[in-house]
Amino acid sequence: MSSTKRARNQVRLSRALGLPLTPKAAKYFEKRPYPPGEHGRARRRTESDYAVRLKEKQRLRAQYGIREAQLRRAFDEARREAGLTGEALVELLEMRLDALVLRSGFARTIAQARQAVVHRHVLVDGKIVDRPSFRVKPGQVIQVKPRSQARTPFQVAAAGAHRDVLAQVPEYLDVSLEKLRSELVRRPKRAEVPVTADVQLIVEWYAR
């Protein structure tokens, strides 16, 4: 799939889900904040409870760019933890390596963060990790590989060019952007994680 087609699909998905998933989608979303399609602007019907819960699950999936099976596994793990399942779900997803690469400002989108990991540009505690789903533990250090830091995308990131579209660095990360290095200092708390999701609706979806 070409980058142009991928970007177009992200714009369409953003409009369908009601939230911008990429910086480019955000610009289009400002102009057309309604679902895609011939009758998108005119749609006013009330959604069923089923549709509302399904959409909320899809919104969370899209923000992390993960498959249904991955979200289901994370939910099953969250359900085994103490406390609120929905909050635990987001906290576990946020500790994915690709998510933390994005939050650290080393990439502009979750897709770019995943690509950096898959292409073996990212180290965890000095060792290459090429699995975007890798669970980072508190105290572990994420860094762009020294040989990769000279590449243009990472030079752009180190200069802080993505800060115009990314949320402020959350308190669970200690980031040295110029060194393309960050540390997960503690487990994220749901309230700190910059994703839009009604987690209770997602819990209700899986509890059907």
From Swiss-Prot:
Transmembrane portions of the chain: none
Protein name stated in the entry: Small ribosomal subunit protein uS4
Highest taxon of the lineage: Bacteria
This protein's UniProt keywords: Ribonucleoprotein, Ribosomal protein, RNA-binding, rRNA-binding
Gene label: rpsD
NCBIfam families hit by this protein: PRK05327.1 (NF003717), rpsD_bact (TIGR01017)
Subunit structure: Part of the 30S ribosomal subunit. Contacts protein S5. The interaction surface between S4 and S5 is involved in control of translational fidelity.
Family to which the UniProt record says this protein belongs: Belongs to the universal ribosomal protein uS4 family.
Lineage: Bacteria, Bacillati, Actinomycetota, Actinomycetes, Micrococcales
